[in-house]
């Protein structure tokens, strides 16, 4: 179809949304004026400014644009919504570098405590949740937003549902990250690991996440392809389960609607159980199911091979969905949690090893007949190595959930090494590979600016990961053995400070590994930036000649 005429009038939806954000800005100004503490006043003022900026953007977009609602097709081609994907891709790299940098800082603080600088906002206690949230939710979350919006459009051959809704999701999510992150630095926290944001940030995330679910679901419902590709099943499981986890773990009663402090509804062992039901399944569905969707789409696309076994991918999906949700109690071994609950969590954790390795095998065997591409394509190599790290982490996790093993590993640096094998090796590498694929596609470039830089990124980051996790494995096992060592008289052989001193060289090695990983991400950011800036545009083929997505 031909391009529509220019429309400068606001739609009913745009008018309503602009009015809603104008009212929100007014209420936030009142909240800032009546705030009981400085952090709440800052966040209320920040929200007022952001709301007014949204109103301005809605009004501004009405000028010099095609018809009020974008056409579903232009000249016979699906008119895909790429703006939100570009925004999330950019924010993923921004938050990734920020999160890796903060991680390097806190790793250095453990090796050299003077780097805390005796300032509250530079202390380890405030920077650590900033690091985890920036890497997991800001970097990882934006990668998932960008890839899910791309994959669901391409595999369904239809534009994203809604006009402003996808933009609300990506902008609203990143504003939530900004509120949560600045809150940590100001001392605003629920003190629940991976669920630190206070009540008003949680409310914002709830609204954004429900909108995300609706956009994704409606896009699938109006698809033009009869089959729902398996990656969309994994994305949908991730979105739905994170919503349930967020609502279950974060009910809280604010001390005042004009203050940042709240009290969580649960207490005691119930709170601990809810927390690690949430914490473990945040790993299981945010850091596993969502990124498995990336694996199932991007590895076949990059390798130009079909998924090794589509049937195995369906078995992998349902087994993972059923088993993962029950495994949380293994985080609470040797605590006040009832013993039968600990054993149940351990049992499901061990069972989880089988579907996890089924998915790993499916991802690796997709390269059947294309293994030679690993020599020439560093992006594919990065994606495949991420699957190997996934297999390693999903073997180590069930092993560490066994009570006998956990009696040594619990509370030690071994757990830190395990987490980062998954976070850096699996999540990091599959995210990097996805962005290396996605940016040229979305910005319509023939390829990346430099494959040689991708190769440098791969080897530098791999060396960083090996240094990091090896140091933490050795440190953790040494730590556990020193804690449980007794003299012939039955006294502890080592004082606590002696165990801390023994960790010092390993903490230096960890910081070095983290520094290398950060350098790799900076190389990637430069490569992607140059791809967008100077990359050669790709000539689009007619729809009839395009390969199926």
Q: What are the residue ranges of the model-derived segments?
A:
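Active-site-proximal inter-transmembrane loops
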Residues: 264-272, 409, 414-416
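Membrane-interfacial, low-structure loops and terminal tails that flank and connect transmembrane helices
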Residues: 1-9, 65-86, 370-373, 445-448, ...
């Amino acid at each position: 179809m031909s391009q529509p005429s220019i429309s400068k009038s606001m739609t009913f939806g745009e008018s309503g949304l602009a009015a809603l954000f104008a009212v929100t800005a007014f209420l936030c100004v009142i909240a800032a004026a009546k705030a009981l503490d400085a952090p709440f006043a800052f966040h209320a003022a920040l929200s007022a400014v952001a709301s007014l900026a949204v109103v301005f953007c809605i009004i501004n977009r009405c000028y010099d644009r095609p018809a009020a609602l974008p056409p579903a097709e232009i000249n016979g081609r699906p008119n895909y919504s790429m703006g939100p994907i570009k925004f999330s891709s950019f924010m993923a790299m921004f938050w990734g570098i920020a999160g890796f940098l903060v991680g390097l800082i806190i790793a250095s603080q453990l090796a050299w405590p003077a780097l805390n600088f005796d300032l509250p906002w530079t202390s380890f206690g405030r920077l650590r949740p900033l690091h985890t949230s920036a890497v997991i939710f800001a970097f990882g979350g934006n990668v998932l937003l960008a890839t899910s919006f791309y994959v669901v459009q391409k595999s369904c051959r239809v534009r994203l549902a809604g006009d402003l809704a996808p933009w609300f999701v990506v902008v609203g999510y990143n504003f939530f990250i900004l509120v949560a992150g600045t809150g940590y630095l100001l001392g605003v926290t629920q003190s629940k690991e991976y669920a630190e944001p206070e009540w008003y940030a949680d409310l914002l995330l709830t609204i954004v996440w429900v909108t995300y679910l609706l956009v994704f679901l409606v896009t699938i419902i109006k698809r033009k392809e009869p089959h729902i590709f398996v990656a969309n099943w994994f994305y949908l499981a991730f979105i739905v389960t994170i919503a349930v986890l967020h609502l279950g773990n974060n009910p809280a009663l604010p001390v005042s609607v004009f203050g940042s402090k709240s009290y969580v509804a649960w207490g005691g062992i119930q709170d601990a159980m809810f927390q690690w039901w949430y914490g473990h399944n945040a790993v299981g569905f945010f850091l596993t199911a969502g990124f498995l969707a990336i694996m199932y789409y991007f590895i076949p696309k990059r390798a130009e091979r079909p998924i090794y076994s589509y049937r195995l991918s369906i078995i992998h999906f349902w087994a993972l969905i059923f088993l993962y949700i029950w495994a949380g109690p293994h985080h609470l071994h040797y605590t006040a949690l009832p013993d039968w609950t600990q054993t149940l969590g351990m049992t499901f954790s061990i069972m989880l090893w089988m579907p996890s390795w089924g998915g790993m095998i499916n991802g690796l065997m997709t390269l059947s007949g294309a293994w030679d591409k690993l020599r020439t394509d560093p992006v594919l190599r990065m994606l495949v190595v991420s699957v190997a790290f996934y297999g390693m982490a999903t073997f180590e996790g069930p092993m560490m959930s066994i009570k006998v093993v956990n009696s040594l590993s619990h509370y030690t640096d071994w757990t830190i090494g395990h987490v980062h094998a998954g976070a850096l090796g699996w999540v990091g590498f599959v995210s990097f590979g996805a962005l290396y694929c996605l940016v040229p596609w979305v910005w319509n470039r023939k390829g990346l600016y430099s494959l040689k830089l991708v190769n440098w990124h791969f080897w530098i980051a791999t060396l960083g990961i090996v240094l990091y996790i090896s140091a933490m494995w050795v440190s953790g096992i040494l730590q556990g053995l020193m804690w449980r060592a007794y003299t012939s008289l039955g006294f502890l052989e080592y004082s606590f400070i002696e165990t801390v001193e023994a960790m010092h060289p390993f903490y230096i090695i960890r910081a070095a590994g983290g520094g290398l990983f950060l350098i790799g991400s900076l190389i990637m950011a430069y490569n992607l930036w140059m791809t967008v800036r100077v990359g050669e545009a790709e000539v689009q083929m007619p729809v009839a000649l395009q390969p199926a997505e």
